[in-house]
């Protein structure tokens, strides 16, 4: 039998071990000293199991930026016409700065437009803002501290609201 097959047979216990061990390592039985183990003291202190006080979750859900009751006066709206998904960063940066953003996705293919709407929806959800569909492939993203009046939304829908920055 070849060496590899013999070793496999020895490993599986089908053949006797040939005893190919070096004699220089010898028997280690005499080299070890036994140590007595000391018993470990167990803690017998009784802890009272009290439930933790319940906190109101609505206090933790407040937005991190600014007071919620203050509504900023609308001074400008940024209109973007992205052509690829790579322009999502521009949408996010303008929205993060507190500027309402109009996304006109009519120049994008449907797959990238869907990705950008998903990005915008996540952005708006994370910051507690709002997203509104103005017309087909045109969306208004409003930060949480900004209120866009109904007549402004109507002007946006009619196409009369351009970038005022």
From Swiss-Prot:
Domain of life: Bacteria
GO CC, one annotated term: cytoplasm
Cross-referenced InterPro entries: Cell_div_SepF (IPR023052), Cell_div_SepF/SepF-rel (IPR007561), SepF-like_sf (IPR038594)
Family of the protein in this entry: Belongs to the SepF family.
Gene Ontology terms: biological process: division septum assembly; FtsZ-dependent cytokinesis
Compartments where found: Cytoplasm
Subunit details: Homodimer. Interacts with FtsZ.
Primary localization: cytoplasm
Disordered as annotated region, ranges: 23-75
Protein function: Cell division protein that is part of the divisome complex and is recruited early to the Z-ring. Probably stimulates Z-ring formation, perhaps through the cross-linking of FtsZ protofilaments. Its function overlaps with FtsA.
Gene that specifies this protein: sepF
Pfam families, per database record: SepF
PANTHER family membership: CELL DIVISION PROTEIN SEPF
Keyword annotations from UniProtKB, A to Z: Cell cycle, Cell division, Cytoplasm, Septation
UniProt name for this protein: Cell division protein SepF
Residue runs in coiled coils: none
């Amino acid at each position: 039998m070849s060496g590899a097959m013999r070793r496999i047979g020895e490993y599986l216990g089908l053949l006797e071990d040939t005893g190919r061990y070096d004699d220089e390592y010898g028997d280690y039985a005499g080299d070890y000293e036994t140590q007595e183990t000391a018993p470990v003291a167990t803690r017998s202190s009784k802890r009272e199991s009290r439930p933790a006080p319940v906190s109101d979750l609505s206090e933790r859900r407040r937005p991190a930026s600014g007071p919620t009751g203050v509504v900023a006066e609308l001074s400008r709206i940024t209109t973007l016409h992205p052509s690829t998904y790579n322009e999502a960063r521009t949408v996010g940066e303008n929205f993060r700065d507190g500027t309402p953003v109009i996304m006109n996705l009519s120049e994008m293919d449907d797959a990238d437009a869907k990705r950008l709407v998903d990005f915008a929806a996540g952005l708006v959800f994370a910051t507690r803002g709002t997203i509104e569909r103005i017309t087909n492939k045109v969306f208004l993203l409003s930060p949480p501290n900004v209120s866009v009046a109904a007549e402004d939304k109507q002007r946006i829908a009619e196409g009369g609201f351009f970038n005022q920055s």
